[in-house]
């Protein structure tokens, strides 16, 4: 799996990453590639493709605070990605969905465990959890 280094683009709006995903999925030059990249995003609300935005989002409040709303290509719920939040994309061309999730997310979990062990081992007492929300394009 290839990793795309997008740091040269800096923090972007969600639309940049959604367009990049769509381009990679449809462009002939990427047809056989399996890719991973991290999104460094500006604050936004991101809704899954099947969500009713008006049911998920307090529209009056969102307009008041000026946070943009985006609809992603994949399913899943609605999230608020605040300052410092990052998202990630895995693009795999083959395999059963559950196997792909297990394989890809296990590497993310391993990375978080390493970060926690390296940087936070003396900061926390007790248990803590890291949660990942995922979606897929069928």
Model regions and ranges:
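Short hydrophobic-aromatic micro-motifs
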Residues: 45-48, 80, 138
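Catalytic beta-strand/loop module used to bind and position nucleotide/cofactor moieties
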Residues: 86-138
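Short, contiguous, pocket-lining structural segments
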Residues: 12, 80, 96, 100
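Conserved active-site and cofactor/substrate-binding residues in soluble primary-metabolism enzymes
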Residues: 15, 19, 64, 99, ...
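A glycine-rich, hydrophobic loop/mini-helix early in the fold
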Residues: 60-92
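Active-site loop/lid in soluble adenylation, ligation, and acyl-transfer enzymes
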Residues: 1-56, 60, 72
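Short secondary-structure junctions
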Residues: 6-7, 69, 117-120
